[in-house]
Amino acid sequence: MANYNDQCGWEGNWYQIGLSASYPFTGYYDGNGYTIRDLKMLDKNAVGASLFGFVNQAIISNLTIEKATITGYGALSAIVGAVTTKGGSINKTFIKGCIVKKSTIESRSDGVVTDGMAIGGIAGMVDPNVNLWIDSCSVEDCTINGAIAVGGILGGGTVYSMTQITNSHNRNTKVTASYNCAGGIVGYADTLYVYSCSNNGSIKGAASTTAPPGNLPANSIYNVGAGGIAGGSGLSTIISSRNSGTVQGSRGVGGIIGSTLVTTQPKTYYNNTFIGFCSNSGNINGDSYIGGLCGEAQLGAYKSYNEGMIKANSSFAGGILGFAPLASITNTANFNKVIASSYSGGIAGSILAGSLGINTNLGEVASYHEYAGGMIGRAGNTLAMNYCSNFASISGSSYLGGMIGEVGDARKWTIMD
């Protein structure tokens, strides 16, 4: 990279390298430690607005972008807009050692963000059949806004995409998604692996009163997903990562991951996520399904803890997990207060089936109405619990327990039972 590294004094828009999915950048780019300043792309209808708009089987490394201003419709970031594929084969792209500082990246708006998806600091969108690996990257003191799938490092990974993010960090970058999936590291990714990442920026998901954008199907899920590391995901594994930023949203809000909700019609289904060796110290709050590590998912959690205060304005709040139809939680601990209108637990608001082993709660648990327990507010019929302990007070109006507020579904017993 030549030592010509800013747009100072030029008022025009940058035209991205790799103008479209048909003509992507393919190859190796080494920024050699240089910094590009004052990059500007201000087209509200742009897709792929970024230094590299569309890339395919590329390696991009060792580059810093500072004081960029990028506005468009979707697949936006400072480094790579969209990672694409050709011919249906699995293609790999690698982004390493890139930094974005003091920049603003946002989807189009007329004073208020109205639409736009896949907005990130390092990469915007990952297409199907793409394996993207982002390593040793960071965003610092930035503002990233959009409607759907907005993340500090990566915005969104589509179905059949595979994303690995390792050793990457969000430092004081504010991330906001007005409809779905805001994350300190990734907004949403289909198949996701995260290792040794951190966030201390504030994360804001949708408000409960936010109406869906007009370009979504009528049966779409919205107002879901906000997380310190990931807003939402398909199948995901998150290891050795931590959040210290505040996270707020409507449904499915967590210190590590928000929600893996797939659908609520005709039945409710979740994807699986595993969280290991992770921690949260940020305050987590929202309307429902709020957890210190995970808001709602089919969850496996191991050797992880929460130190932030957890609050659900409505129901399902837990020091580790808000709600899961199926969960296995082992060697976890909660150290702060958990509050909900109903269904609050030191470890989980509610789990329908699964197991808890060697878990500890030291935070006060309170339900303004019903179902509060030192471990779980309300448990289903098929839950095993061993070597768990609660050392904090439990309060509420009904269905309270030192370990579990209530166990089992209501049944009418007959003589045949």
Each predicted region: which residue ranges?
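Surface-exposed repetitive/solenoidal architectures
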Residues: 1-417
